[in-house]
């Protein structure tokens, strides 16, 4: 059995977990998250604890049990505290502006970029070169951050572009004559 799957997920007060076959719904102060888990995983709920076990005789069930446990744990954390991802814009004239359900970006192209945010993800810009994305769904948050970064990923010579706040960009040395 997976080491990750052996650890049970504790359900904190104020969080409601509903199991319906292979579908799990986690409801908390930050909203409701639903996910369909792999059929090779057996989920049992005992008071305020969720336990995960692989189905016997199914190839890859151990790995799927660990994955399901990690996904459900992220759902519980998401509906209680939420997740956030910070992006930093490095470069002359690179600007960001939060506009309700979208983020306006000026990244040196001939046109401004207006990136629509999916339902459940919010953005704020403390400064013109910083974007803070917040969501209860960790996977969706990571995907939105990656989509915004993909518009202008950091280049290796000057490091200009959109990067994660904790990302270290290794710069190359310029060509010598």
Swiss-Prot record:
Q: NCBIfam families annotated for this entry? A: L6_bact
Domain of life of the source:
Bacteria
**Functional note:** This protein binds to the 23S rRNA, and is important in its secondary structure. It is located near the subunit interface in the base of the L7/L12 stalk, and near the tRNA binding site of the peptidyltransferase center.
Q: Which family does it belong to?
A: Belongs to the universal ribosomal protein uL6 family.
Q: Which GO terms describe its molecular function?
A: rRNA binding; structural constituent of ribosome
List the PANTHER family.
60S/50S RIBOSOMAL PROTEIN L6/L9, LARGE RIBOSOMAL SUBUNIT PROTEIN UL6M
Upper lineage: Bacteria, Pseudomonadati, Pseudomonadota, Gammaproteobacteria, Aeromonadales
- What is the protein's given name? Large ribosomal subunit protein uL6
Record's keyword terms, sorted: Ribonucleoprotein, Ribosomal protein, RNA-binding, rRNA-binding
Gene3D superfamilies tied to this protein: Ribosomal protein L6, alpha-beta domain (3.90.930.12)
Q: How does it assemble?
A: Part of the 50S ribosomal subunit.
GO cellular component terms attached to this protein's record: cytosolic large ribosomal subunit
**Which InterPro entries does this chain map to?**
Ribosomal_uL6-like (IPR000702), Ribosomal_uL6-like_a/b-dom_sf (IPR036789), Ribosomal_uL6_a/b-dom (IPR020040), Ribosomal_uL6_bac-type (IPR019906), Ribosomal_uL6_CS (IPR002358)
Q: Which GO terms describe its biological process?
A: cytoplasmic translation
